[in-house]
Each structure stands twice: as C-alpha cells, then as structure tokens.
A protein has these predicted regions:
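Short beta-alpha junctions and helix-cap segments that line functional grooves
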Residues: 3, 105-107, 136, 252-254, ...
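Short hydrophobic/aromatic residue motifs in ordered secondary structure
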Residues: 60-62, 156, 272, 300
Length: 317
C-alpha cells in the first residue's frame, strides 16, 4: 500500500529493523509453517494464523479482531492466495494501529504552550522506567528543549540515584528529596522549579509498586492533584512504561495501571532482546492508548518515537 513509504532516516530505520529482528524472524517462521502446503486462505489457514498471532503475544482480543477482518476480505474476494497473506496482515495491522495511533510523528516533539509540558511516568520497577526517563531527557534536550527531572519515586534509594546518574549524564537539573519523602512534595517542588526556570519539559518519575492497587491509585491521584496547584492542567501526559520482553505480563501491568490512573501514552521497552514484539500491537488495541515510544536497544539513541508504518514495515519485511 502507498502509505508504507519510508519515513525514518536510514540510520534510525536500521536500528528499528535490528531491534525487531527476533520478533520478525519468529513471527515469519511461524507464519510460514501456518500456510505450508496451502495455496489459498481457508479455515485451516485462519485457525493456524490465530495460533501464530496469539503465540506472538498479540493477545487474544486483538488476534480475533485481525482474524475477523481477514475473514471478511476472504469472503468478499472469494479467493485469497496464501502468498498474499503477508501483505494482507501488514495492511490490517497497520489499519488497527492507526485507530489508536493517529499521528505520524518521527521526532521527539511536545505541543506548543507557554507553561512547561509535564510528563508523569508510571510503571512497575524493573521495566526500564528510569532509563526511559533519562533517554527522553536526552532526546528532548537534543531537540533544543530545556528539561527538568523530578525524582518522585521516593521509596527506593536506587531509583533516586539512578535518576541522578541520568541527570548528570544528560546535564539536566534533577529535583530530589531524601528517600521516604512525600512523592507529592517532590512533584510540587519540581514543577515550582521548572516554572521559575521557564523549562519546556518536566519529566517526573513515580513509584512502581503494584502490591496494593488502592494505595497506588491514591498516591498517583495525590501527586496529580498537587501538580495542579502549581500548574493547572498538569500532568499533560501520563506515560506508562512496559517491558516488551515480558509478553502477556505487560497486559496485566497495563490493566492495573489504567485502573489506577488515566494513562494517555505508552512506552514499550526492551524489544531488541525478545521475540515478543507483537505485544505492541495488542496493548495499543486492547487498551485504546497510543504507543508513543519504543525501546529497541541499550544505546541512548535507541529509544524511538513510535511510528506505526515503520514498525509494521520492520515487523513484516
């Protein structure tokens, strides 16, 4: 289809291709076996395709949606050869991703506004939350924006220390307090500091404990409420960070965090080390939240703005 034109730079596209290599190889291998010995898409092929999508961590709900769409095309066209299946899947998955990822961004951008753009970052410990914040700070700074970080995950000394390392590395200010301090107090101080400095972007880390949903909800609600005292409308974005390598566990994390607070965007990390990249498709569709960033490598440049067309192209090429 014509919308699969090249959007990324050659270097960025190569990084994405490399990061999705394990996912692509696994998926295409399974797809090849699903259509082996078949010349047309029939009920057996669709049953096999359903297994392929579910085992590729696309998720049952999204898989059934894709199968229904392909069934409709087969029914309409009467005959669809298995050789066309790759192309049809590309088109249907791109269309599905377009429903929640309407933009076509390729660069790290924020909306034009007078006040700082505030991003509150949520996610369980160990998913790459702090690293994602550090890489975001780097990318926004590289794009000419001034950035302030806030260490509101005050329950782990390591979280504050890790964020300090990233702040030093990217040469951006970090607002922090002692371990055990009130997270809302840190958020308040961070926004006050950012407003005084006339900063463009504020990124605030929050605690990643999931053992008690009510406590998590109350804590995040309080942090947001306190932010609004300094800056009405803040946070402008609530970014949920998920570890792509955990597959179905990422769905469970998304379920818990979307129940605890309003999540407006998702970052999926660690896709380079896994064959579970299908999780990006399922998470975005099932929760109707756009995927904004994906992590496709360990380097500071390997956090990319998610572009649905480039993702699908790398997934199926």
């Amino acid at each position: 289809m014509s919308f699969f034109k090249k959007i990324f730079s050659k270097e960025k596209k190569e990084t994405l291709d490399k990061g999705l290599e394990k996912t692509k190889t696994s998926f295409l291998d399974k797809l090849g076996k699903a259509v082996a010995g078949k010349s047309k898409v029939d009920e057996d092929v669709l049953d096999n395709l359903e297994e392929v999508l579910v085992s590729s961590d696309v998720g049952v709900t999204t898989t059934l949606k894709v199968i229904d769409r392909i069934e409709a095309r087969v029914s309409k066209d009467k005959y669809v050869g298995t050789a066309e299946l790759n192309k049809i899947l590309r088109e249907e998955i791109a269309a599905l991703l377009s429903e929640t990822n309407s933009g076509n961004a390729t660069e790290f951008e924020i909306p034009q506004q007078d006040a700082p753009y505030v991003i509150m970052v949520v996610g369980v410990n160990g998913v790459g939350k702090t690293t994602t914040i550090g890489k975001l700070a780097h990318q926004f700074k590289k794009a000419g924006k001034s950035v302030v970080l806030g260490a509101a995950d005050t329950f782990r000394a390591a979280a504050i220390d890790q964020l300090q390392i990233w702040a030093d590395r990217t040469n951006v200010p970090l607002v922090r307090q002692n371990m055990g301090s009130d997270p809302a107090s840190v958020a308040f101080d961070t926004l006050e500091s950012a407003v005084k400095q006339n900063a463009d972007v504020v990124i605030i880390d929050t605690a990643g404990r999931l053992h008690n949903k009510v406590n998590l909800m109350n804590e995040l609600t309080k942090v947001k409420r306190v932010m609004q005292k300094v800056l009405p409308g803040a946070p402008h974005e609530v970014l949920l960070v998920l570890d792509g390598s955990t597959g179905q566990n990422a769905f469970e994390q998304a379920k818990q965090f979307t129940a605890a607070t309003e999540v407006t965007a998702i970052a999926v990390t660690k896709l380079d080390g896994t064959a579970k990249g299908g999780v990006v498709i399922g998470i975005s569709d099932q929760f109707q939240i756009p995927v904004k960033y994906i992590g496709v490598g360990e380097g500071v440049e390997d956090l990319q703005v998610f572009n649905k067309f480039e993702f699908v192209d790398s997934f199926f090429k």
